[in-house]
């Protein structure tokens, strides 16, 4: 069972040290605007940032077109796990680790914990599940990375001006949006760990 104690005792496995090369994947809704980086969802709500200016010029103001509005545009039409893994293997990768959920709060897997996931919205596919099955089928090691911990503050810029982050009907997606220096609640920390 996962706990802070069990996590502190975890030792890096030998296979990981021996592998030397693997693929770490950042891919999600933030790829739709394709501007800046995977931190676009945060930066588009930071008044004055390049992403903020780009967003308004390209999509309109954040109270009319927010980050959530990219989800239907994220279709993953060219996502082909078999081809991806074959390419990774050809490159010499021994393991594949996608980000299951980035700081944006959008899960790339089928889950009942949140409606904001790739199976129920956007591509309507269990991206992580499909990739995991193919990685294992082709004999590589599969792992996951969760970046949910920073969701605590990630979209807090949207609380400082008229944006959709302020709309209560999206609280379950935009998250707590606290200040970075605020102490995370034990409930939030356990939510991230588990």
Stretch-by-stretch model annotation:
Residues 1-194:
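Mature catalytic domains of secreted/periplasmic carbohydrate-active enzymes
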């Amino acid at each position: 069972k996962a706990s802070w104690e069990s996590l502190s005792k975890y030792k890096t496995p030998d296979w990981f040290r021996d592998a030397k090369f693997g693929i770490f994947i950042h891919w999600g809704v933030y790829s739709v605007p394709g501007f800046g980086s995977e931190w676009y969802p945060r930066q588009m709500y930071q008044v004055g940032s390049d992403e903020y200016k780009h967003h308004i010029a390209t999509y309109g103001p954040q109270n009319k077109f927010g980050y959530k509005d990219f989800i239907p545009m994220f279709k993953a039409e060219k996502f082909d796990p078999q081809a991806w893994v074959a390419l990774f293997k050809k490159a010499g990768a021994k393991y594949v680790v996608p980000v299951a959920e980035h700081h944006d709060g959008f899960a790339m897997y089928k889950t009942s914990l949140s409606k904001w996931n790739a199976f129920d919205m956007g591509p309507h596919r269990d991206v992580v599940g499909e990739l995991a099955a193919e990685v294992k089928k082709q004999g590589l090691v599969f792992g996951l990375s969760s970046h949910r911990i920073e969701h605590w503050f990630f979209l807090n810029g949207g609380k400082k001006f008229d944006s959709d982050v302020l709309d209560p009907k999206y609280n379950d997606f935009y998250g707590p949006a606290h200040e970075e220096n605020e102490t995370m609640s034990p409930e939030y920390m356990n939510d991230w760990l588990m």
